[in-house]
Design a protein with these regions (language model features):
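Face-selective signature of the C-terminal outer-membrane beta-barrel domain
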Residues: 319-341, 368-494
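Acidic/polar loop-and-plug regions of large Gram-negative outer-membrane beta-barrel proteins
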Residues: 228-233, 240, 245-326, 341-375, ...
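Outer-membrane beta-barrel translocator/receptor signature
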Residues: 154-157, 168-245, 253-257, 317, ...
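Membrane-embedded beta-barrel scaffold of Gram-negative outer-membrane proteins
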Residues: 323-328, 332-338, 342-348, 527-528, ...
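Acidic, small-polar-rich N-terminal luminal/periplasmic segments of exported/outer-membrane proteins
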Residues: 25, 50-189, 534, 570
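Gram-negative outer-membrane beta-barrel transporters
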Residues: 589-591, 606-699, 733, 760-762
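C-terminal beta-signal and adjacent terminal beta-strands/loops
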Residues: 690-698, 716-763
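Structural signature of Gram-negative outer-membrane beta-barrels, strongest in the C-terminal barrel
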Residues: 250-254, 375, 394-396, 400-406, ...
Length: 763
């Protein structure tokens, strides 16, 4: 085999791990020696945390799972008075569950699933919120974070999940909701925290979190480091290797003017896993999927990739400058400037069944998918927020302007041979392009070639927006929450292919709003009703994914309008047990209208509709001083009301329809429960149960992944004032289940039983 590969540089994470180890060892020795000489109690410190190896400071008093207010100034009221469903996954939940990635963290939030990536849909995070694709609706500290990524959380303090359409908050997209990742920032205290995690399947993770004040405590520097490598429990050959660094610097702590500078860098080098092929309910050579689930040939550890061919390398670089000034006691002006660049480079095996090899011959075609992509984004966001009194009513407001430029370049590799072979041969046949369903060998020799193909697509987008939010206290028992946003979104895609060049463009303008009325029968509770909208214009993902309203080569899409989503919601929120436990309940209807549908060959119209009726419940916080819980339930009744014709634009099926089918990636029922109990001041035990109903991968409801229940357990023990031990066992029963469904061909299998032991240091 020969291949020419454009590599995204990935430095050795072992060097970073060694550096973390040296720093921790030196710091531990110095502080332990000091502790031996001086046993006087130190001043109170706030919680400090480190992702999966979260370490808390001394005399911790903020380990609750309850969060009272979102970080973004666009939320102009505490969560109990916010008329929409918002779930915040706090640092303590990330620590206790040993989460290391965004997908790990969101397991604790029911109603969210993840879709699988391929070639056109990039590998990485592809969340579905309330049944709607949200891969372009992730924000970092309130600024859209574009580009296909598998996000780490070593530098993340909390994750905010806003459910329901909310284009008034972030602009385009957000049909089902959005995610906001809150970064760790410099603090007004000194600390050094670190952790080593050793686990099954050669898991090794090191983290370091250092914060230091200087300039007479008016400035602070914080540094987060991470090194992570692991194989995957229950999966042959698959491995993940990544490292990251995130320095940040703040000037003006405790003063009216504050300046924050931050940088985030992460690289990964993986042998990726696309999981298992779907089986067919029939052995006929021309069988179509009817109601088929993945098949592993009798061994759930089977891996259908090739070590000699497959790889995935990623990188992310994000630089941010934020300046905040208090104009007076009731008004603050803030400007955030960010430049980000993310990249992916991969060739991976898709266990393909399109030639019916699985059911006819018991074999799998190792189809090669590839991608080389780079996304750059520059955003400037200016916000003015505060509060004032007018006509006897209190206003808590936030208003701002946003300007963003985005560009994505996508190309790939030419992999040959990569045609659709009929694999009527034994494993390793066809030059390694075919393998056995029941006994694949990832070490098979592959007699092919991988060469860089620079033909691809360059997509650019420019957006401009103005927005305003206000919570008006009509009287002590009634609140009115409103939000308005106006966007212009101009995008252009230039395609360079062997058949020639094409140029597509679209200019959209859209207005979104939200309104909610809140009644507070008591100070610690509320009952609300709300309405919110979102808009998804043509090309909203800027080339980073296959979207329902994306550009179509050879078709005029300039006349297509933004897809529109509306949400009606009725809910209630209560803070009980001395305001330490938050309980919420909501019923809602989300309707996506004006969706683009296929009506005939090469003809699309804005005439489709889909709908989700749902119920959500949640609980977060402390039941007693020793016992706390983070739990939720989601019921989603989804329906494709008018999905248009079946088929693709060149091959339209004249008869038949998916009308009335369940929406893909939308479980009817999902449930999560995580709870811990402090048996003694030093010993804590906990556990979790996570249930997800059957999920369809396609609009035709012909392929699906079965429902599953996963159980986790944890125990932590404080060895000393400065050293903790924590044991986590994830997927306690070693359940074989699938956590990502693709519309055809395959589904991703989740990890088996994984044990993790973390030693944490905090000074």
């Amino acid at each position: 085999m020969s291949r020419t590969i454009l590599k995204i540089p990935v430095s050795s994470p072992r060097m970073l791990a060694s550096a973390i180890g040296v720093a921790l060892s030196a710091g531990s020795a110095a502080h332990l020696a000091q502790a031996a000489e001086n046993t006087e109690p130190k001043g109170e410190r706030n919680p400090i945390s480190l992702g999966a190896t979260n370490i808390t400071g001394q005399d911790q008093d903020n380990t609750s799972y309850q969060v009272e207010k979102a970080s973004s100034q666009k939320y102009t009221a505490p969560l109990v008075d916010t008329p929409r469903s918002v779930t915040v996954v706090p640092q303590q939940v990330l620590k206790d569950t040993a989460a290391t990635s965004l997908q790990d963290a969101l397991r604790t939030v029911p109603g969210i699933t993840f879709g699988a990536g391929e070639g056109g849909n990039p590998q990485g995070d592809r969340p579905f919120i309330r049944g709607f694709d949200a891969q372009g609706d992730t924000y970092l500290d309130g600024v859209r974070d574009t580009g296909g990524q598998s996000r780490e959380i070593f530098d993340i303090e909390s994750i905010e999940v806003s459910k329901g359409p909310n284009s008034s908050f972030g602009g385009r997209g957000s049909a089902g909701g959005s995610l906001n990742l809150v970064s760790k920032t410099p603090q007004a205290r000194d600390f050094t925290n670190g952790g080593f995690t050793y686990g099954s399947d050669q898991t090794r993770r090191c983290v370091l979190d250092v914060n230091r004040q200087f300039l007479d405590d008016s400035a602070a520097f914080r540094l987060n480091l991470m090194s992570h490598e692991q194989n995957v429990a229950g999966r042959d050959a698959v491995n993940y290797d990544r490292w990251g660094v995130a320095p940040s610097l703040t000037f003006g702590l405790g003063t009216p003017t504050r300046v924050n500078l931050s940088y985030y860098h992460m690289e990964s080098d993986d042998l990726p896993d696309s999981g298992m092929p779907y089986g067919y309910g029939s052995t006929a050579s021309n069988a179509a999927h009817v109601h088929d689930k993945p098949t592993d040939g009798g061994d759930s550890s089977n891996f259908y990739g090739l070590k000699s061919r497959d790889f995935r390398k990623t990188r992310a670089d994000i630089s941010t400058v934020s300046i905040e000034h208090d104009l007076n006691d009731n008004m603050t002006l803030k400007n955030t400037l960010r430049h980000g660049s993310t990249g992916q480079d991969y060739v991976l095996t898709q266990p393909d069944d399109s030639q019916h090899n699985v059911n006819q011959f018991g074999t799998v075609w190792r189809r090669a998918n590839s991608r080389v992509s780079t996304t750059t984004t520059t955003t400037n966001q200016t916000d003015l927020f505060g509060n004032f009194q007018l006509a006897g009513m209190k206003h808590s407001y936030s208003t701002g302007l946003e300007f963003t430029g985005e560009e994505t370049r996508v190309s790939g590799y030419t992999v040959s041979p990569n045609s659709n072979p009929v694999c009527n041969v034994s494993k390793g046949g066809m030059g390694g392009n075919c393998t056995s369903l029941s006994n694949p060998n990832p070490d098979d020799a592959w007699n092919g070639n991988v060469a860089r193909n620079y033909n691809g697509t360059n997509t650019k987008a420019t957006s401009r927006a103005a927005y305003v939010f206000d919570t008006i206290e009509l009287d002590p028992k009634w609140l009115l929450n409103v939000g308005l946003r106006y966007d212009t979104f101009d995008t252009q895609a230039n395609t360079n292919a062997a058949t020639g060049r094409t140029k597509l463009k679209d200019d959209s303008q859209f207005f979104n709003w939200q309104a909610g009325l809140v009644w507070k029968p008591t100070e610690n509770g509320s009952i609300y009703t709300s309405y919110a909208t979102s808009a998804s214009p043509v090309g909203g993902l800027v080339g980073e994914g296959q979207e329902p309203n994306g550009f179509v080569t050879g078709i005029n899409t300039s006349d297509l309008e933004p897809e529109e989503t509306v949400n009606y919601e009725l809910g209630t929120k209560w803070d009980l047990f001395h305001d330490r436990l938050s309980l919420t309940a909501a019923v809602f209807r989300t309707e996506k209208k004006n969706t683009r549908i296929l009506v005939s060959s090469n003809t699309f119209e804005n005439g489709g509709e889909s709908r989700v009726d749902g119920l959500e419940l949640s609980a977060s916080g402390k039941i007693t001083d020793q016992w706390q819980v983070f739990a939720g339930y989601s019921y989603l009744k989804s329906e494709l009301v008018d999905p248009g014709r079946i088929g693709n634009r060149q091959n339209v099926v004249s008869a038949g329809s998916n009308k009335g089918n369940q929406m893909p990636n939308t479980p009817k029922n999902s449930f999560s429960l995580w709870t811990t109990y402090d048996i003694t001041p030093k010993l804590t035990v906990g556990g979790g149960a996570f249930y997800v109903d059957e999920v369809y991968g396609d609009a035709g409801n012909t392929v699906y992944v079965p429902s599953y229940t996963r159980y986790d357990a944890m125990a932590s023990y404080k060895l000393t004032k400065n050293v903790d031990l924590q044991l986590n066992v994830q997927n306690l029963t070693d359940k074989t289940y699938y956590d990502k469904a693709y519309s055809a061909h395959f589904a991703n299998q989740a990890a088996g039983r994984t044990a993790l032991l973390t030693t944490s240091f905090h000074f």
